[in-house]
Amino acid sequence: MGKSKKIVMTGGGTAGHVTPNIALMPALQQAGYEITYIGSYNGMEKELIEAQNIPYIGISSGKLRRYFDWKNFSDPFKVLKGYGQAISLLKKIKPDVVFSKGGFVSVPVVLAAKHCHIPAIIHESDITPGLANRIAIRGAKKVCCNFPETMKYLPSDKAILTGSPIRRELFSGDADAAVRYCGFPDRNKPVLLIVGGSSGSKAINDAVRKVLPELLENFYIIHLCGKGNLDEHLKGLIGYAQFEYASAELTDMFALADMAISRAGANAICELLALHKPNILIPLSAAASRGDQILNAKSFEKQGFSYVLEEEQLTEQTLLSAVDEVFNNRDIYVKAMAESGQMDSIGTIVKLIESQTK
């Protein structure tokens, strides 16, 4: 009997740094890997990973910011503490390989892997690498990426175009189950799914709610509005179902949805592409981010997969006309997505992990 293979996975902070790891887990287990997950003590990744029955270990983590904040003085010490904890854990677990999906908790784990001479592979979802991955690249053997445009920002001897791992269960949702869960009276109208990212989006929530009467004339609406963003006044409105967040139910909601309005996080838009869902992307503004969502959205718009509405242009009128435009031309968007020739991301990444396993 061969030696058992071990992998440590890391990544957290937002759902986009966790769900691709979850997508890889069944294939890694099938390939014979024993998985341990290292995340932050109380990050959202803890709940998501423990729901998969994967051993989870929390370490100290801090955020590296590009702006002034008093926490900038204390957080480097948290990161250093996390680095020490990660070294101890890796020496104890003795994994063959480390796989990181990014986010600040991943930096000490990847750098600890280099210190312990354990090969580390990281995955960058966005067109330009985020700060955490830019630091972690130094400790990585290979860097997987989502977009062809990203290759030029990465060391040529490390960069590999893999696409984004998509959870297989997303393709097997039950539309009728979503009708029941959302309390819709029937399936006589097309369904518009609105997703503001794992923490929600005030700009999208406000714009959608202002035009609800007009939207509800033609659509049933599923609105994932983020934690603490439910509107009590809209409870019981026929054809409008609002939820803070969806986990297991999301696959059914995707199956029911005819089109989507979404932020432009790389993982979210890759799921829309894989499912061939016509969509309107409203990327986080450059003022509120490093601009990665704007680049992601423009790449998808250029390829004919998405309609982009920048947050600065988001009004009641522009939103309604965008919905009309995309819904009336939905077949064109679906055709472009169906012809995109997507990669077998999970298979490619698992092979890469196996190539680095001692």
Feature-to-residue mapping (PLM):
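C-terminal alpha-helical cap of glycosyltransferases
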Residues: 342-358
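Donor-nucleotide binding loops and adjacent catalytic segments primarily
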Residues: 43, 48-52, 175-180, 184-260, ...
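Active-site-proximal region of nucleotide-activated glycan assembly enzymes
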Residues: 6, 34, 44, 55, ...
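A short, well-ordered alpha-helix in the C-terminal region of glycosyltransferases
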Residues: 331-343
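Glycosyltransferases and closely related glycan-assembly transferases
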Residues: 85-98, 106-121, 134-139
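Acidic donor-binding loop of glycosyltransferase active sites
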Residues: 95-97, 243, 255-270, 277-278
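Conserved nucleotide-sugar phosphate-binding/catalytic loop shared by glycosyltransferases and other
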Residues: 4-12, 29-78, 87, 310-312
